[in-house]
Amino acid sequence: MSSNNPRVFAMVAGEISGDILGAGLIKALQKQYPDAKFVGIGGPRMEALGFESIFSYEELAVMGIVEVLSRLPRLLKVRATLIDELVKTQPDCFIGIDAPDFNIGLELKLKNRGIKTVHYVSPSVWAWRPKRIFKIAKATDMVLSLLPFEKAFYDEYQVPCTFVGHTLADDIELESDKAQARELLGLDKEAEYLAILPGSRGGELKMLAEPFVKAASLIKLRYPDIKFVTPLVNQKRRDQFEQALREHAPDLEIHLIEGHSREVMAAADCILLASGTATLEAMLVKRPMVVAYRVSPITYRIAKGMMLTKRYSLPNLLADDDVVEELIQADCTPEKIAAAVATQLDNDFTPMYDRFMQMHKGLRCDASARAADAVIKLVEDNV
């Protein structure tokens, strides 16, 4: 592509967290390339910046091995169409944002056709399926990692990797304001709140809404004055959660809010949440938390056989320590969840707070700017 033509960047982001990262990267790249074009699969935040989506990013929001298999024909068709479109477009660079099972195969095909490729957000090769690093080495010109310990892993295998920090650590203030968050959301200024976050995907709510609302009922028995608040990403997830409430806790009152998950966490005294990126946000707003997760039994058996780490949540992985309680699969029961939340409500939070603050500072690196700088260097290098 001639240097006189506007740069073209192709991206694929598969869920909300990827949409946030993609939007930050687009903003940073637009400072260097104001006329750049951005195409691929992105979410609403990316599209608000002019990103042109070829498919809806909901296409990629699939959890679990069994669940992916049921959608595999459609996912393969989406990927094949994308490859055809991007080979015609010949972007200056393709950036796959997370969604490794979809993006790494796509990156390999594009790299073999002469397109520079970047994978933004390292897959958890240090935790499970470590042999993926050899495919990553073939598929990408560079990995952009969010977590500091990941670069050392890639360096060991001589795979180009740049640690950029995490955009969430940049966006979230070191001290979050509980009173301000409650005012924004219209919550009681004095009440004790438990935030309940059962995930953003339909599959997550299918597995977690029931144990979470049953646990909330048990917590209400022990703490009669406690209040509950739950953010849900859209009307579909709200309908799902309300159905679970009707079936499993019809008398329980939970304040439901569309979006604003970060503000809900900041407003809370304690957080019960699904394992995932939200655990990092909970750590960054510095609230005590309990992490719980379960998937289909078949998915769990397959995944467990490939795991290299016994920890799941990002705070525990970052700390290399059991900082927050994790209740996974068989332990994800209403009784165990309620007991773990009670422990957090009753105990001194100071030691956990201090660990959270230390980790927050370590991730605060102006990640979008660093990621953009690495992409720009790759694009401008014509060797």
Curated annotation (Swiss-Prot):
<dbReference type="GO" id="GO:0005543">
    <property type="term" value="F:phospholipid binding"/>
</dbReference>
<keyword id="KW-0444">Lipid biosynthesis</keyword>
<keyword id="KW-0441">Lipid A biosynthesis</keyword>
<comment type="similarity">
    <text>Belongs to the LpxB family.</text>
</comment>
<comment type="function">
    <text>Condensation of UDP-2,3-diacylglucosamine and 2,3-diacylglucosamine-1-phosphate to form lipid A disaccharide, a precursor of lipid A, a phosphorylated glycolipid that anchors the lipopolysaccharide to the outer membrane of the cell.</text>
</comment>
<keyword id="KW-0443">Lipid metabolism</keyword>
<dbReference type="GO" id="GO:0016020">
    <property type="term" value="C:membrane"/>
</dbReference>
<dbReference type="InterPro" id="IPR003835">
    <property type="entry name" value="Glyco_trans_19"/>
</dbReference>
<dbReference type="GO" id="GO:0009245">
    <property type="term" value="P:lipid A biosynthetic process"/>
</dbReference>
<dbReference type="Pfam" id="PF02684">
    <property type="entry name" value="LpxB"/>
</dbReference>
<keyword id="KW-0808">Transferase</keyword>
<protein>
    <recommendedName>
        <fullName>Lipid-A-disaccharide synthase</fullName>
        <ecNumber>2.4.1.182</ecNumber>
    </recommendedName>
</protein>
<keyword id="KW-0328">Glycosyltransferase</keyword>
<comment type="pathway">
    <text>Bacterial outer membrane biogenesis; LPS lipid A biosynthesis.</text>
</comment>
<dbReference type="GO" id="GO:0008915">
    <property type="term" value="F:lipid-A-disaccharide synthase activity"/>
</dbReference>
